[in-house]
Amino acid sequence: MGPGGRQSAEPASTEVFGDSDFVVVANRLPVDQERLPDGTIAWKRSPGGLVTALEPLLRRRRGAWVGWAGVVENDVDVQDEPIVQDELQLQPVRLSADDVAQYYEGFSNATLWPLYHDVIVRPIYHREWWDRYVDVNRRFAEATARAAARGGTVWVQDYQLQLVPKMLRAMRPDLTIGFFLHIPFPPVELFMQLPWRTEIIQGLLGADLVGFHLPGGAQNFLILSRRLVGADTSRGTVGVRSRFGEVILGSRTIRVGAFPISIDSGALDQTARDRNIRRRSREIRAELGNPRKILLGVDRLDYTKGIDVRLKAFSELLAEGRVKRDDTVLVQLATPSRERVESYQTLRNDIERQVGHINGEYAEVGHPVVHYLHRPVPRNELIAFFVASDVMLVTPLRDGMNLVAKEYVACRSDLGGALVLSEFTGAAAELRHAYLVNPHDLEGVKDGIEEALNQTEEAGRRRMRSMRRQVLAHDVDRWARSFLDALADSRPNDSADAAD
């Protein structure tokens, strides 16, 4: 029984089996639906490291991907037939306008997202949002149960679908189920604020393996499993891709581990070496007036990313004369995000006001000191910006990993550039030769930026070489293999016979 006397309905077990031995479950399909001028529907592949890493396995193991196609539907009870796109089987889950408003924009991104990111913005708790979250998670679980072959493996992705493992286990006890959280898992005292805290932990414990970016998230989950569910758990520290924690729940043992996600670093390294990318990077510098130094920020426009922190630090460095306005520029690329959520609308207004103030104070006519783009940037153009810039600014207040930091490093085969990186990113645990800063300490951020701008060539090359060694050795393929190997080892001996 949940808060307020509510009960989470248990899905009924199903005897229906699909034909996919491996199923990925995520909020979005790796394709976007497009309606052509003649009214027909086409599917456009959306880029992403996850599908790149999992595609070979999906092909090899008769895989399927369950997710939302990004289009609002009126009748969510219709079960769409699987889509075959580039030989991948995709199983759409329909969402209505109310689903998007309450499950996605509401509970996922106005309740869970701020709660899991250290309550930078106050989470909103609405019973209606929770009820919709339960309902949509059930639909994802049902679609997965229909797609998965007998004794198959299912990998559920991220915070939008934390109830799916338990629901799916009730429907299909024969399956081996893994779950990975792509955002930070909060400290115990913050998670305890959630009215539906027990239901979330119970939902995750439906998996055989629960994965986080960092050991700290795994440790928090073990504590909450003891406190909220009364489970027995291991007490030792959790390692990275090793020394897994365990939760004992009745006859089941759930493994808990840390698996830092990464990027397709080899492919990115090769693309950044392309002569056209190199030429474009030189053009970018020329278009910016050939400044001595270019600072770069690349983020979704999100309040967790610390865009305001780097802008304020840059403004004060200009005011103090520690950075010269006639030879240094800051480029901020901000991808639009969750534009219907009020806190994101407020953030955009604040950032644009900040940019205007800095340029009004320090720019010359036709020569802004901050170049701000609020729109998506094509992939190759983004890579050219990485190659062109001298200092990459990654200053989130909280971030599960931050792949932009790793992408920048992967693009710098010339060993040029410098990375200023927030201590509160998962990437900071791996990229120890970045200029690590506390985004809550403005003076420290300013010092980090100044050090990066003024580093010697030898010191910069030494730092970048070390970071590249880490990023190229630990790519997204290694991340996926390490998780799936651990999941295979977590498979109960009797799982294949559990449905008999």
UniProtKB/Swiss-Prot annotation:
Binding residues for D-glucose 6-phosphate: R28, Y104, D158, R338
Enzyme class: transferase
Site (Involved in alpha anomer selectivity): W113, I183
A cellular component term, taken from the record's GO annotations: cytosol
Record keyword Transferase present: yes
Pathway: Glycan biosynthesis; trehalose biosynthesis
Transferase keyword on record: yes
GO biological process, one term: trehalose biosynthetic process
Molecular-function GO terms, alphabetical: alpha,alpha-trehalose-phosphate synthase (GDP-forming) activity; alpha,alpha-trehalose-phosphate synthase (UDP-forming) activity; trehalose-phosphatase activity
Catalyzed reaction equations: ADP-alpha-D-glucose + D-glucose 6-phosphate = alpha,alpha-trehalose 6-phosphate + ADP + H(+); CDP-alpha-D-glucose + D-glucose 6-phosphate = alpha,alpha-trehalose 6-phosphate + CDP + H(+); GDP-alpha-D-glucose + D-glucose 6-phosphate = alpha,alpha-trehalose 6-phosphate + GDP + H(+); TDP-alpha-D-glucose + D-glucose 6-phosphate = 5-methyl-UDP + alpha,alpha-trehalose 6-phosphate + H(+)
Amino-acid positions noted as binding UDP-alpha-D-glucose in the UniProt annotation, renumbered to this chain: G48, G49, R300, K305, L403, V404, A405, K406, E407
Matches recorded under InterPro entries: Glyco_trans_20
Keyword set, alphabetical order: Glycosyltransferase, Transferase
EC number: 2.4.1.15, 2.4.1.347
Function: Probably involved in the osmoprotection via the biosynthesis of trehalose and in the production of glycogen and alpha-glucan via the TreS-Pep2 branch involved in the biosynthesis of maltose-1-phosphate (M1P). Catalyzes the transfer of glucose from UDP-glucose (UDP-Glc) to D-glucose 6-phosphate (Glc-6-P) to form trehalose-6-phosphate. Probably also able to use ADP-Glc, CDP-Glc, GDP-Glc and TDP-Glc as glucosyl donors.
Family: Belongs to the glycosyltransferase 20 family.
Assembly description: Homotetramer.
Name recorded for this polypeptide: Trehalose-6-phosphate synthase
Naturally occurring in which organism (per UniProt): Mycobacterium marinum (strain ATCC BAA-535 / M)
